[in-house]
Amino acid sequence: MARYRGARLRITRRLGELPGLTRKSARREYPPGQHGQGRRKRSEYAIRLEEKQKLRFNYGVSEKQLIRYVRKARRTTGSTGQTILQLLEMRLDNTVFRLGMAGTIPGARQLVNHGHILVNGRVVDIPSYQCRPGDVITVRDRDRSRKLIEANMEFPGLANIPSHLEFDKPTLTGKVNGIIEREWVALQINELLVVEYYSRMA
């Protein structure tokens, strides 16, 4: 399944608030479609599927990428669900977003893809790059790059920078000081249901 490029508010009406995908809120509380206002009871599978879809659309990853993160999380010690969240949160595109350099994760991904972002002094144009403690994230020393990010910072996607990051606004320099803690994940999600969804599939 490819990365979604359709109407974002249609997705938030179906899945709820997705802070990484869009800053806008859906006007209607019920899902889109002819039968969106129905109250039909959902199956356990449908509930687990919805939680999985929240991850995919919020972080902008394909099904294949998400399966890779699930498999990687299973090979580590500790909570598989929390590890999946940490892997997604520590992606470069998400880190740029959480530092306030872009209003959404798709916007941050575009900055990375176009070579505006440096990690430890080198251009990294891979959005899925896994940031590590000690990484220093800066803006390429070009007038266009700096103006883009300064404009983005006028309208940040989220108000608070998580505790594992620090950011110096005058120099547009961010630093990764650790791995994100669960309480700082902005997406409202039950990651255990995601693990259950993939228990027989990934």
Swiss-Prot record:
Region annotation (Disordered) ranges: 18-44
Keyword entries, A-Z: Ribonucleoprotein, Ribosomal protein, RNA-binding, rRNA-binding
Alphabetical list of Pfam families matching this protein: Ribosomal_S4 (PF00163), S4 (PF01479)
Ribosomal protein as UniProt keyword: yes
One annotated Gene Ontology cellular component of this protein: small ribosomal subunit
Gene Ontology molecular functions: rRNA binding; structural constituent of ribosome
Domain of life: Bacteria
A Gene Ontology BP annotation from the UniProt entry: ribosomal small subunit biogenesis
Database matches in SMART domains: Ribosomal_S4 (SM01390), S4 (SM00363)
PROSITE patterns, alphabetized: RIBOSOMAL_S4 (PS00632), S4 (PS50889)
Family: Belongs to the universal ribosomal protein uS4 family.
HAMAP family xrefs: Ribosomal_uS4_B
Assembly description: Part of the 30S ribosomal subunit. Contacts protein S5. The interaction surface between S4 and S5 is involved in control of translational fidelity.
Name the record gives this protein: Small ribosomal subunit protein uS4
Taxonomic source organism: Picosynechococcus sp. (strain ATCC 27264 / PCC 7002 / PR-6) (Agmenellum quadruplicatum)
Gene that specifies this protein: rpsD
